[in-house]
Amino acid sequence: MARTKQTARKSTGGKAPRKQLATKAARKSAPATGGVKKPHRFRPGTVALREIRKYQKSTELLIRKLPFQRLVREIAQDFKTDLRFQSSAVSALQEAAEAYLVGLFEDTNLCAIHAKRVTIMPKDIQLARRIRGERA
């Protein structure tokens, strides 16, 4: 129950306080939202930290295979039409792409921490790439 500011009042008689106690008891026994229980919510950041631990423990690929394969084929079409890929080649490309992204996000996080922030921003990614020498 939310706290409210209490002001001093004159007591008018013996019956008023008893009535007030009865209403308080009734308020406590019945939920304020009409019997509908609110779903449990974790504090901001708790779920994010849990997900970080979960994904740092795991080794499986995080990008879905078919969308990544479509992207690879779409990019390859710009260089040569009717290219064929072995499934192991697409898997190797996906492993390399995910390893690159994980490393980039690690460096990006360090840039954000260096700027005394916990939230990464596009400028952190740009700085990380610039320091790596990927982008002049």
From Swiss-Prot:
Predominant location category: nucleus
Phosphoserine sites (modified residues): 11, 29
Subunit structure and binding partners: The nucleosome is a histone octamer containing two molecules each of H2A, H2B, H3 and H4 assembled in one H3-H4 heterotetramer and two H2A-H2B heterodimers. The octamer wraps approximately 147 bp of DNA.
Compartment(s) of residence: Nucleus; Chromosome
Entry-annotated residues carrying Phosphothreonine: 12
Family statement: Belongs to the histone H3 family.
Site (described: Not N6-methylated): 37-38
Protein name: Histone H3.2
Alphabetical UniProt keywords: Acetylation, Chromosome, DNA-binding, Methylation, Nucleosome core, Nucleus, Phosphoprotein
Functional description taken from the UniProt entry: Core component of nucleosome. Nucleosomes wrap and compact DNA into chromatin, limiting DNA accessibility to the cellular machineries which require DNA as a template. Histones thereby play a central role in transcription regulation, DNA repair, DNA replication and chromosomal stability. DNA accessibility is regulated via a complex set of post-translational modifications of histones, also called histone code, and nucleosome remodeling.
Modified residue annotations for N6,N6,N6-trimethyllysine: 5, 15, 19, 28
Region Disordered, annotated ranges: 1-43
KW Electron transport (keyword) present: no
